[in-house]
């Protein structure tokens, strides 16, 4: 049994999802959003860092999947997103978690079967795979999808010894 944290980073809303990976598949543990409000950027980044740290302390995941930054039309937004990712990554690294990064296309492919899936399709598959009866918040749904993608990737890497080989070395880029 492995607890996996998925993070959908954002400078205003960061989604998180925790799943338990067992031999039978994945089970829902928790999800939600870290809302940073409209303060100064450094204050919002501190809220992301503390929020992720609290989630790790509360649930005890051993590994984290996080979405990579995509190049947005607005460079300022992409920079802020990258900084929020950094705050979440540092929180996970401080706690000793294995960290893996995934593109949005990889997450959609792993969860919905196609890299072109829309947010509603991803959410419906997350609900189906985790047997959820209520729709999670969209950012939490994305984070759960990232956690499921990470679980799927770990399942295919573990038989080859790749997951544990990189555990202490920091980020595992896929």
From Swiss-Prot:
GO molecular function, a single term: magnesium ion binding
Cofactor, free-text remark: Binds 2 Mg(2+) ion per subunit.
Protein name: Crossover junction endodeoxyribonuclease RuvC
This enzyme's EC code(s): 3.1.21.10
UniProt-listed NCBIfam families: ruvC
Signal peptide: none
Role summary: The RuvA-RuvB-RuvC complex processes Holliday junction (HJ) DNA during genetic recombination and DNA repair. Endonuclease that resolves HJ intermediates. Cleaves cruciform DNA by making single-stranded nicks across the HJ at symmetrical positions within the homologous arms, yielding a 5'-phosphate and a 3'-hydroxyl group; requires a central core of homology in the junction. The consensus cleavage sequence is 5'-(A/T)TT(C/G)-3'. Cleavage occurs on the 3'-side of the TT dinucleotide at the point of strand exchange.
Lineage of producing organism: Bacteria, Pseudomonadati, Pseudomonadota, Gammaproteobacteria, Pseudomonadales
């Amino acid at each position: 049994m492995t607890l996996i944290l998925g993070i959908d980073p954002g400078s205003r809303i960061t989604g998180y999802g925790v799943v338990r990976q067992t031999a039978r598949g994945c089970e829902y543990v928790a999800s939600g959003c870290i809302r940073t409000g409209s303060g100064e950027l450094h204050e919002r980044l501190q809220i992301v860092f503390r929020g992720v740290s609290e989630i790790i302390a509360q649930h005890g995941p051993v590994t984290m999947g996080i979405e990579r930054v995509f190049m947005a039309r607005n460079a300022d937004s992409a920079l802020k997103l990258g900084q929020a990712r950094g705050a979440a990554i540092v929180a996970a690294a401080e706690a000793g978690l294995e960290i893996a990064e995934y593109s949005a296309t990889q997450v959609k492919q792993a969860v919905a079967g196609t890299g072109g899936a829309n947010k509603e399709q991803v959410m419906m598959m997350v609900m189906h795979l985790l047997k959820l009866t209520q729709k999670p918040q969209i950012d939490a749904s994305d984070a759960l999808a990232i956690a499921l993608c990470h679980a799927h990737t770990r399942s295919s890497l573990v038989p080859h010894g790749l997951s544990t080989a990189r555990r202490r070395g920091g980020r595992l880029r896929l």
